[in-house]
Amino acid sequence: MLAARGQWVLIGGMNPSLNLFLIGPTGAGKTTLGAWLAPRLSLPCVDLDRVIEAQAGQPVREIFAHEGEASFRARESAALLEHSTHAGVLLVCGGGIVTHADNRAWLRQRGFVLWLRVSAPTRARRLADDATRPLLAGDDLLARLQQLDAARAIWYRECADAVLDETTDENIDALGARALALLHVHWRRGAAITGAPA
C-alpha cells in the first residue's frame, strides 16, 4: 500500500516480531523518535551507536579516525546481533547499518523494520553544526548526504517493512503519533520471531 509523501508507505506487509528496528539516514531523527516511542510501546530503547561508544570507550568519530570504517562496521554488526537476539526491544540503528548484507538479513529476520525517511535538505539543516558525524566531513554537506542517500536507498527499501516520511515542520508528537498509528495497523507484535541464521 502506498500513501502520499508525509504519510507512510507499507512495503512488506505484516512482519510478526516482538522487536522494532528504526533505520534511516544520518539526521533523520531516529534517536528522538525511538526515545518517544519506547515508553509508549513499553519497550527498552537501545541506540546502537551509544552501545558501540560505551564498548569502545570513545565516540564514533574517534573509532572511525583510529580504527577505520571497517572496524566500526564490525562493531556495529556485533552490537546488532547481541541486542536483537532476545525478543522485545526497540533498536535505533546507525545510518550505515544497511551497508552489510548480513545486517539487512538479520534486521528482516529479527524485527519489524521502520524506515524513517527525511529529505537531504532537511537533514542538512539539522546537521549543519554537528561535527560528530565522521562520514559527513567536507565542505558540501548537502551533496554528501545526497550521495549517501543515492547509495543506500535501495538497501533501506530492501529490509524495511514500512516507511515513515517526515514532513519539514512536523514536531515529534505528530511524527510519533503517525508512527504509532502505522505500527498499530501493520505490526503483529507478540508473534513468534525466527531464530539465528545458520
Sequence positions of predicted segments:
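P-loop (Walker A) phosphate-binding loop of NTP-binding proteins
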Residues: 25
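Conserved lysine of the Walker
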Residues: 30
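A glycine- and Lys/Arg-enriched "phosphate-lid" helix/loop adjacent to the NTP-binding pocket
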Residues: 109-154
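Post-Walker A helix-loop "phosphate-sensing" segment adjacent to the P-loop in P-loop NTPases
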Residues: 39-48
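ATP-dependent small-molecule kinase phosphotransfer cores
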Residues: 47-108, 132-133, 146
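NTP-dependent small-molecule kinase module
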Residues: 8-15, 36, 40, 112, ...
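Hydrophobic anchor at the beta1->P-loop junction of P-loop NTPases
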Residues: 22
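Hydrophobic positions on the alpha1 helix immediately C-terminal to the Walker A/P-loop
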Residues: 33
